[in-house]
A protein has these predicted regions:
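C-terminal low-complexity, charged extensions that often adopt amphipathic alpha-helices
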Residues: 123-152
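Start-of-domain marker
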Residues: 21-100
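C-terminal motif of bacterial Sec signal peptides marking the signal peptidase cleavage site
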Residues: 13-16
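Gly/Pro-enriched, hydrophobic low-complexity segments
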Residues: 20, 146-242
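Short beta-strand segments
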Residues: 66-68, 91-93, 113, 184-188, ...
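An acidic-aromatic
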Residues: 80-130
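Short acidic, glycine-rich loop/turn motifs
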Residues: 57-63, 84-86, 106, 179-182, ...
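Positively charged n-region of N-terminal signal peptides that target proteins for export
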Residues: 1-4
Length: 242
């Protein structure tokens, strides 16, 4: 497992919380402005203090493909914690992100990774913060304020700018995000929202940054507002990944 795969796998697992209110939209008026869409999406966010997710993740990089079971815990504005387990429930990676630091434990190679968020972002060549990641995990992605071209139909709004685009549903949920930074591309898709909690059961991430990387998580269990015990301890015998 190379360094890129080690870092990106952990970051994605790190790679959602509140229940969003569904808004009925009248598409008979096609003269929507980009600012209206942006304000509707960004004001529609609703966070829960705690979010717990369980599911399966498929990760593809180059010719490698792995499928793991994942547990994700998000404590709002504080910690994103993830455990990824392989066959027979054996843990492969445990990771933790705070607003300023990234920690990963690789059980297979008996190594750990500790970097500032800024250092990790530079290594990955992706402009993504703790809060951006939290917004994706909690299904509350924000739309950056830029000059957009707007295309729409009865189901979607499509906001397009030079370096970013958003596909927004008629209930003001962001379904797809594409970002381009220094020829590196990041694409995120949130799908299969359930009516009872208005939360996506499937998230797909694609990264093109010298090497291609794709990960898809399908959630089987979603819990809101239930506090969880978070454990993260680096074994003394593990070496640090530089």
């Amino acid at each position: 497992m190379n360094k890129f795969f080690f870092i990106v796998s952990g970051l994605f697992f790190l790679n959602s919380c509140g229940v969003k209110k569904v808004t009925n939209t009248d598409f008979s008026n096609s003269l929507k402005k980009p600012t209206e869409i942006i304000n509707s999406v960004n004001s529609n966010s609703n966070y829960s203090k705690w979010l717990s997710l369980k599911g399966r993740a498929k990760i593809v990089q180059k010719n490698q493909e792995i499928t793991v079971n994942v547990n994700i815990i998000n404590r709002q504005d504080s910690i994103i914690w993830v455990s990824a387990k392989g066959p027979f429930g054996i843990e492969i990676i445990r990771s933790q992100i705070t607003p300023d630091s990234v920690f990963l434990i690789n059980r297979i190679n008996k190594k750990h990774f500790t970097k500032s968020v800024l250092e990790a972002r530079e290594l990955l060549k992706v402009d993504f913060s703790f809060y951006d990641l939290q917004d994706i995990i909690t299904a509350n992605p924000k739309i950056l304020k830029k000059n957009y071209t707007l295309k729409s139909n009865r189901e979607f709004f499509h906001l397009i700018a030079d370096s970013v685009s958003y596909l927004v549903t008629n209930t003001y949920k962001v379904q797809n995000i594409k970002r381009l930074t220094n020829k590196n591309t990041l694409e995120i898709t949130l799908e299969e929202y359930l009516k009872e909690d208005n939360f996506p059961r499937k998230i797909n991430l694609k990264v093109e940054a010298g090497e291609s990387f794709e990960a898809t998580i399908e959630y089987s269990k979603v819990e809101f507002k239930k506090p969880k015990k978070i454990l993260f301890e680096i074994p003394n015998l593990y070496n640090e990944e530089n």
